[in-house]
């Protein structure tokens, strides 16, 4: 068989069975509903492992239960012992022996046979042979599958604990695939998750590299379930996602880029996951800077100086550049998938929004539309607010063309975003014009927006026309019933004169 030369000898060090002892005796009975508790241990020294002169072990606890009634008992028949003896002699093919005794072996006896050949001193190659035969004969029920999957997971776990090479772990998955062991989950994802749970993320990266090398060089692919396929990112995408969940955004991006630059080819969706990590990194940076500014205003920390500002902008630009590179690779690898193009522009849009790059974000909005992926209305509003804060007049005009086709509630929300964008950028004259435009349209701006504009206009009064604009705004708000009568105080320094006017 294909796996006979590479798989190891798997053994059990300790077995505790309520009705089953390591040394089997005839006339011994097992209750079908009894619980079988096994501590399985793997010692591999055969095949490739034997050639390396390695000696390791794998342990796991497995519980086997039966759904049969409590009162029944099942005798271990003569066929079971004869099959064990024949298999141990290794004078005939295991499949021939099992085929000959098929009608004499119950499901429980076949489970015990799998356990038996995993014992210390037994050749666990027979375990795989027995399971493969069961699979071929369609005799793998839920309990047998659960037992075999647990054995394999335990072997993988111990290999990882003992810091075995990534190719040895992958070889084990190949053996699993060869014998037809296909659990309802992705074994590839399970292995990566085990690496991460044990805090061995660097080893997980090496394992993923081994997977890509085997796939690209020899065509080996272990799917096993819908995990990676469902996520469409494959093992690279899954590991990047694990890094991202743990908050290690830079590591997720570094890994995907390093794999690509080393000549390996991650799946197209893994680039999208890495781009999501960049979005989260930029968003985290923005939150940190806002917190820093808040602490600086409170006097807890010093203000950001010019040198720090340059470093921040440099880091942000470098992060965006990496995102653009990932986008290029994603488009190259996903040319046959139209949906990927739209998602790429969506990720780029999110990146530019987090970085506060208005014109670039607007460009991605239109590219998303051209790719057939309609952006949400809120994204339009956010981009427009960023452009307003940077006084990008042309971009704001283009984005405002949607307003005339909106209902009153949606229109109010969009204009509120525009107003807040102007306020954030310190453009209070434009904010006041937007405020008046909302009032003229019968839309009452929120109280906090009105206050922000009024306070900003007050601070900006320096020229005669600033006074006129402020007084005009006060009168317009009063006429709309949004403020009470206003007392406007003005001091003329030249004449040392105070002028008070009721509006």
UniProtKB/Swiss-Prot annotation:
It is found in: Plastid, Chloroplast. PPR repeats lie at residues 341-375, 376-410, 411-445. Belongs to the PPR family. P subfamily. The lineage of its organism: Eukaryota, Viridiplantae, Streptophyta, Embryophyta, Tracheophyta. GO terms for cellular component: chloroplast. The keyword Chloroplast applies. Transmembrane segments: none annotated. Keywords: Chloroplast, Plastid, Repeat, Transit peptide. Signal peptide: none annotated. This is Pentatricopeptide repeat-containing protein At2g30100, chloroplastic. Gene3D superfamilies: Tetratricopeptide repeat domain. Residues 1-50 form a transit peptide.
């Amino acid at each position: 068989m294909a796996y006979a030369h590479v798989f190891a000898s798997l053994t059990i060090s300790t077995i505790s069975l309520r009705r089953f002892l390591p040394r089997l005796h005839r006339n011994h009975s097992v209750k079908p509903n009894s619980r079988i508790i096994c501590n399985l241990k793997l010692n591999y020294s055969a095949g490739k492992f034997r050639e390396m002169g390695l000696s390791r072990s794998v342990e796991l606890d497995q519980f086997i239960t039966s759904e049969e009634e409590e009162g029944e008992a099942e005798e271990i028949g003569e066929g079971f012992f004869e099959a064990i003896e024949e298999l141990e002699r290794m004078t005939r093919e295991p499949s021939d022996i099992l085929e000959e005794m098929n009608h004499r072996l119950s499901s429980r006896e076949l489970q015990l046979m799998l356990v038996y050949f995993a014992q210390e001193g037994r050749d666990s190659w027979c375990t795989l042979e027995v399971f493969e035969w069961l699979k071929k004969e369609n005799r793998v029920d839920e309990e047998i599958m659960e037992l075999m999957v647990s054995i394999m997971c335990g072997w993988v776990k111990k290999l990882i604990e003992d810091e075995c090479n990534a190719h040895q772990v992958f070889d084990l998955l190949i053996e699993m695939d060869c014998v037809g062991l296909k659990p309802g989950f992705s074994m590839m994802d399970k292995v990566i998750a085990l690496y991460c749970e044990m805090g061995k993320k660097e080893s997980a990266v090496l394992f993923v590299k081994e997977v890509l090398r085997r796939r690209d060089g020899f065509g080996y692919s272990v799917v096993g379930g819908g995990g990676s396929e469902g996520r469409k990112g494959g093992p690279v995408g899954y590991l990047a996602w694990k890094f991202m969940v743990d908050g290690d955004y830079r590591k997720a991006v570094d890994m995907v880029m390093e794999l690509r630059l080393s000549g390996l080819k991650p799946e197209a969706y893994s680039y999208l996951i890495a781009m999501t990590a960049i979005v989260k990194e930029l968003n985290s940076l923005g939150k940190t800077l806002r917190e820093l500014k808040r602490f600086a205003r409170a006097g807890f920390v010093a203000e950001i100086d010019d040198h720090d500002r340059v470093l921040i902008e440099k880091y942000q630009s470098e992060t965006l550049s990496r995102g653009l590179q990932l986008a290029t690779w994603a488009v190259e690898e996903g040319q046959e998938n139209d949906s990927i193009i739209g998602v790429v522009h969506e990720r780029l849009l999110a990146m530019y929004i987090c970085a506060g790059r208005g014109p670039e974000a607007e460009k991605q909005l239109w590219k998303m539309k051209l790719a057939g992926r309609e952006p949400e209305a809120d994204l339009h509003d956010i981009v427009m607010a960023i452009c307003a804060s940077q006084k990008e007049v042309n971009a704001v005009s283009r984005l405002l063309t949607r307003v005339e086709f909106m209902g009153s509630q949606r229109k109010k929300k969009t204009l509120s975003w525009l107003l807040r964008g102007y306020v954030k950028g310190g453009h209070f004259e434009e904010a006041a014009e937007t405020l008046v435009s909302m009032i003229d349209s019968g839309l009452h701006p929120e109280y906090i927006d009105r206050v922000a504009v009024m306070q900003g206009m007050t601070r900006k009064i320096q020229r005669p026309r600033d006074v006129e604009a402020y007084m005009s705004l006060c009168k317009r708000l009063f006429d709309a019933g949004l403020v009470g009568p206003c007392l406007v105080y003005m001091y003329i320094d030249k004449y040392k004169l105070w002028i008070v006017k009721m509006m």
